[in-house]
Each structure stands twice: as C-alpha cells, then as structure tokens.
From Swiss-Prot:
Biological process according to GO: tricarboxylic acid cycle
Top-level taxonomic group: Bacteria
The name this protein goes by in its record: Fumarate hydratase class I, aerobic
Oligomer and partners: Homodimer.
Cofactors that this protein relies on: [4Fe-4S] cluster
Family to which this protein belongs: Belongs to the class-I fumarase family.
Residues noted as binding [4Fe-4S] cluster in the record, renumbered to the chain: C105, C224, C318
Enzyme Commission identifier(s): 4.2.1.2, 5.3.2.2
Length: 548
C-alpha cells in the first residue's frame, strides 16, 4: 500500500454565502489588538440578542424562497385541488403569523443552535449560557409553546416551563466572524429522521435510486408536507451522517460542490435530486391529501465512508421550514432576512376566505347522530366542523389508558365529543386560543381500539396517515379518523377556534386535556366505519399504475 503526501481537505467546502441579512444592532461588539492581530470582542449580550431575535423571526416568518415554492403550487396545472387547497392555507397561515402574535405552528419546537466561532473572536466564555438566555427570552416573551420534558427519574417527567434546554453545538473555525444556524425543530419533522446501516452493495445506479424512493414513501404525511427532503449517503460515522441530514434539510449545504474528489470532499448529486423529486411527485401522496406536491425539493449529499460501513440518512424540514442564519462581525449582529409580507404570494382572486364545497357537521348533537352523518360520505370528503371538540395528545391518552386499566372507565367528555390530537401554544391577549394545529396521529394508534371499545374516541381529528390497527378498530366499533391540515395553526386559532378551556390535568401544560368550540373547522374523512383508508387507496392507485 503506497503512501500519499499529506493533504488537508475541508470536509464541506462551501461557496460564498449569498444569504441576505439585516443589521440588528452594531452594539456589543468591538475590535481590539492582540499580538499584532485584530480581535473581534463580542459581549454576552450580543449572543443573547442574536438568539432572541433569530428564534422570534423563525417562529413567525419563513424564507422567501420557501414561500415562493408554496405559491408556485397554486399556478401548477398538474397540482391536485387538494394540493392547491393546502398551499393556500399555508400562505394564509403565514400571512397571519407574520404579524408576530400567533406563531406559524403550535409546535414551536426544540431550539437548536449550530455556531462556528472564528479563532479571532473573543467572548470571555459562557457562550452556551448567553445563547440559552436568548432562547429563554423568546419563549417566555412570545406566544410560543413549552415542549421540553425533563426526566425526574427514568419514568417520571415534568415540563421545564421554559422550553429549555436548547441544543447548542459550537465549533472552532478560522476567521474573525461568529456564524450561526438556528433551527426551531418540531417533533413531527424531527421524528422523520432515520439512519439505515447499509453496505457497498447498495451503491449501484440500479439499486440506490429505488432504495431511496422506498424509504421516501415511508415518510408518509404525518410531518406536514410538502417537505424539503434530505438524503445523505456515507459518512465517517453514523452521527456525522445524521448531522449532515439535519443541516442539508435546512439548505445549509446547498453550495457544496457537485462532484467528489480523491480527498473525500462532500458533494451534492443534483441529477439524482431531480430524479427523486419526480419520483416524489409520482407517489400520489401530495400535500397531505393526495396529489403531486409531496416535496418541494430534495437534497442528496455523498460523503466519504469507512470501507466496512455505508450509513444512509433521511430527514425532512416540514412546511414550517423554520431555519434562519445569523452572524456577528465587526459591523454588528446580523440576522437572515425572512419574508415579512407573505400575503403578496396569495393571488388576488384567492384572497377571500371562501373554502369551496364542504359538508357542514354539527358536533353539538348526540355522538350517534354525528357518526350516522359521517357514514353517508366516502373517504376524502371535505368537512366543516362546528361545535365542541376535546383536545388531548400523548400524556392525556396515557392517563385515559391508566383509568381504563384500573377499571375506572372513561370520562363522559371523551364519549360525547370528538377528540383533537393537539397541544396549544400560549394564548395571546385578546384571542380565544393560541396557535393550535394538529399533532401526529400515529403516536396514539395503540390506544384507539381500547378507547373505542368503551365508547370513547369515536371521532379522532389529527394529521397524517395511520396504521392498520386504527382502520380495523374504526370498522369494528363504527368510528372515524378525520384529517386536519398539518401546519396552518395560526389560521385555525384566528378563524376557527372560538374558545379554549382546560378540562383536566392543568399541571401538564400543553399536554393537558382541553375543550374548544369551533366554527368552520376544516377536516377530511381519512378513515371511515367501513374499513376504508384514504392513504391505502392512494397506494393502491399508485401500485395499479406501476403494474400498467
């Protein structure tokens, strides 16, 4: 084995950053000299201000390029009516959220900060604490949600009440700037991050593409498509692979080279990206309820690997594409410019709030009457819900199961009303509710049969596809699963939710059981009482096309 001369290869060689920034302030930074070199001195207040503003902006606004992609769906003749309906709701939601009161999504996420600190930047230490203070200030002062649970022991948890801890990863680099990527990562999209340990045998044109298409299909719709999908093939370790997935889904590596070299530089395979995007469009899942727009775009990054390993990673950034860059240099603190006026992307003829044909459902009736009405319509029927809905999610369902297991039976409210899987953000002053969109339905699948057997949870409302056990339970017990659009939580809070009150377990915060009154709350029948599943029908349609 011959030796080669030393050559250092930057693993992720990026071109110039063309991101558009705005100056937050020129305070809290200064320039000094040490041993003949100019040093950028950054006060802790600068880090706190940067984190505070970045997470505020990302909670209420999205990138212009993302908004343009959503708007393009409305003009695409190949987009389904459901694609266009969902896209319009996203734009309306962004228009409301950009006012800075109701956040884009009720799951205001885990705060993730990736920082790269130049060697000629001095802060005096305590960077993580200063950044965490900024995250704290954002979540305390804005109408966001506290989603972090701290373990007291292996099984008992308590909500931290601040949305801390944040995930803060800081790196030392060359230069005299301090650069950041801030991500508000919701649970739905975070849960769609996967690592597969494969081998060299996968790395053939005939196998790799089909493999990635099948993995892409497993994403389903629970994480609020259209997605920004990222695949990473290779990596010097599993953790390097998944870190790259996260950053690629945030467009952080868009300026990588498009070919590799003998030293192991990362690169994008743009041709494979194009091919996979076409395959995503052909899946038929569309923007949640069937159609073309399962993905806005796809990134495929190839990394070097150990000869015995071939990690493959997959992840997404969802319709709440909350990624924002920031930096500190000698001019001051800079924040990436997001879209302040998303309403401009809504065509004039679609500015009025009319939703077209929908079946009106009065929920303030006996459950048997509501079920009988729903039974008249096929899956995919669009509904307009009006009346009382119970709101409960993961811990609430665990509490209800505990009651059933102890022989206590179910509370009457879970029998009399539909249940909406959700957890509200803080309620702004003068509003009936904070942002309150649906959470992922699949996490509650294991509870459905037991609940419905006791007359509860007969109508469920949430987002995304569900497992066969839910379809079987609904057929057995006469229940329904209704789909709500994942993503436009601000629209629902402003337009559909008229009141919100806690019913039980207030100590659980957003995981408590709530009651809401709604008007014209949009939903679709996804699973009915006859064993029909909307998403299974889409898959069968696609399989039939493949056979032909």
């Amino acid at each position: 084995m011959s030796n080669k001369p030393f050559h250092y290869q930057a693993p992720f060689p990026l071109k110039k950053d063309d991101t558009e920034y705005y100056l937050l302030t020129s305070e809290h930074v200064s320039v000094s000299e040490f041993e003949g070199q100019e040093i950028l001195k950054v006060a802790p207040e600068a880090l706190t201000l940067l984190a505070r503003q970045a997470f505020h902006d990302a909670s209420f606004m999205l990138r212009p390029a993302h908004q343009q992609q959503v708007a393009d769906i409305l003009r695409d003749p190949e987009a389904s009516e459901n694609d266009k309906y969902v896209a319009l709701q996203f734009l309306r939601n962004s228009d409301i959220a950009a006012k800075g009161v109701l956040p884009t999504c009720q799951d205001t996420g885990t705060a993730i900060i990736v920082g790269k600190k130049g060697q000629r930047v001095w802060t005096g230490g305590g960077d993580e604490a200063a950044l965490a203070r900024g995250v704290y200030n954002t979540y305390i002062e804005d109408n966001l949600r506290y989603s972090q649970n701290a373990p007291l022991d292996m099984y008992k948890e308590v909500n931290t009440g601040t949305n801390l801890p944040a995930q803060i990863d800081l790196y030392a680099v060359d230069g005299d700037e301090y650069k950041f990527l801030c991500i508000a990562k919701g649970g739905g999209s975070a849960n769609k991050t996967y690592l597969y340990q494969e081998t060299k045998a996968l790395l053939t044109p005939g196998k790799l593409k089909n493999y990635l298409v099948e993995k892409m299909r497993t994403l389903g719709t629970a994480a609020c498509p259209p997605y920004h999908i990222a695949f990473v093939i290779g990596g010097t370790s599993a953790e390097t692979n998944l870190k790259t997935v996260k950053l690629a889904s945030a467009k952080y590596y868009d300026e990588l080279p498009t070919e590799g070299n003998e030293h192991g530089q990362a690169f994008r395979d743009v041709e494979l990206e194009k091919e996979l995007l076409i395959e995503a469009q052909n899946l038929g899942l569309g923007a949640q309820f069937g159609g073309k727009y399962f993905a806005h775009d796809i990134r495929v990054i190839r990394l070097p690997r150990h000869g015995a390993s071939c990690p493959v990673g997959m992840g997404v950034s969802c319709s709440a594409d909350r990624n924002i860059k920031a930096k500190i240099n000698r001019q001051g603190i800079w924040i990436e410019k997001l879209e302040h006026n998303p309403g401009k992307y809504i065509p004039e003829e679609l500015r009025k709030a009319g939703e077209g044909e929908a079946v009106r459902v009065d929920l303030n009736r006996p459950m048997k009457e509501i079920l009988a009405q729903l039974s008249q319509y096929p899956v995919s029927t669009r509904l307009s819900l009006n009346g009382t809905i119970i709101v409960g999610r993961d811990i609430a369902h665990a509490k209800l199961k505990e009651r059933m297991d102890n022989g206590e039976g179910l509370p009457q409210y879970i029998k009399d009303h539909p249940i909406y899987y959700a957890g509200p953000a803080k309620t702004p002053e003068g509003y009936a509710s904070g942002s309150l969109g649906p959470t992922t339905a699949g996490r509650m699948d294991s509870y459905v049969d037991q609940l419905q057997a006791q007359g509860g949870s007969m109508i469920m409302l949430a987002k995304g596809n569900r497992s066969q056990q839910v379809t079987d339970a609904c057929k057995k017990h006469g229940g329904f699963y209704l789909g709500s659009i994942g993503g436009p939580a601000a629209v629902l809070a402003q337009g559909s939710i008229k009141s919100l009150e806690c019913v039980e377990y207030p100590e659980l915060g957003m995981e408590a059981i709530w009651k809401i009154e709604v008007e014209d709350f949009p939903a679709f029948i996804l699973v009915d009482d006859k064993g029909n599943d909307f998403f299974q029908q889409i898959q069968l349609t696609q399989c039939t096309r493949c056979v032909k």
